[in-house]
């Protein structure tokens, strides 16, 4: 399971001109799920995201987490995070989980992250063509991969 974490001052996702989720200061999470992902991947990512110290403290040092600062999170499913460009120039998405596998895992990820943060995590619309707008803060962008925890 892969998550691209972006620290934002605000973010929103719309589908067909309708806003499905929006946040103020916090983290935009682009979430990609692979065929072999499962509950253990979710647990690791939820702990890491909720406790990741990427928000400034009073001294301007990145020393606070989403939990510490009461920040918000917006989760958007994105199968293209599992693109492979090993052969040719057209990305292959064969490692990305099909909807019947990825949707329940995405929903569980959102539920567990909501519980960890103590607030609802808004989302995009699973499988839809979405427009994501954001204002990067920093910018701070962190790549998390449950199969390669660095």
From Swiss-Prot:
Its EC number is 3.1.1.96. It catalyses: glycyl-tRNA(Ala) + H2O = tRNA(Ala) + glycine + H(+); a D-aminoacyl-tRNA + H2O = a tRNA + a D-alpha-amino acid + H(+). One of its GO terms (biological process) is D-amino acid catabolic process. SUPFAM superfamilies: DTD-like. It is found in: Cytoplasm. The keyword rRNA processing does not apply. Belongs to the DTD family. Homodimer. An aminoacyl-tRNA editing enzyme that deacylates mischarged D-aminoacyl-tRNAs. Also deacylates mischarged glycyl-tRNA(Ala), protecting cells against glycine mischarging by AlaRS. Acts via tRNA-based rather than protein-based catalysis; rejects L-amino acids rather than detecting D-amino acids in the active site. By recycling D-aminoacyl-tRNA to D-amino acids and free tRNA molecules, this enzyme counteracts the toxicity associated with the formation of D-aminoacyl-tRNA entities in vivo and helps enforce protein L-homochirality. A Gly-cisPro motif from one monomer fits into the active site of the other monomer to allow specific chiral rejection of L-amino acids. PANTHER family: D-AMINOACYL-TRNA DEACYLASE 1, D-TYROSYL-TRNA TYR DEACYLASE. This is D-aminoacyl-tRNA deacylase. It comes from Chromobacterium violaceum (strain ATCC 12472 / DSM 30191 / JCM 1249 / CCUG 213 / NBRC 12614 / NCIMB 9131 / NCTC 9757 / MK).
């Amino acid at each position: 399971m892969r998550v691209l974490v972006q620290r934002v001052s605000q973010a929103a996702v719309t589908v067909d001109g309708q806003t499905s989720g929006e946040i103020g200061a916090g983290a935009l999470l682009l979430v990609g799920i692979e065929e072999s992902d499962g509950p253990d991947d979710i647990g690791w990512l939820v702990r890491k995201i909720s406790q990741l110290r990427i928000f400034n403290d009073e001294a301007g040092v990145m020393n606070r987490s989403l939990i510490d600062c009461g920040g918000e999170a917006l989760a958007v499913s994105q199968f293209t995070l599992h693109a492979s460009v090993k052969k040719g120039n057209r990305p292959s998405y064969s490692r990305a989980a099909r909807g019947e596998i990825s949707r329940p895992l995405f929903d569980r990820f959102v539920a567990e992250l909501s519980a960890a943060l103590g607030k609802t995590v808004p989302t995009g619309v699973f499988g839809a063509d979405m427009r994501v707008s954001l204002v990067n803060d920093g910018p701070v962008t962190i790549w998390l991969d449950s199969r390669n925890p660095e």
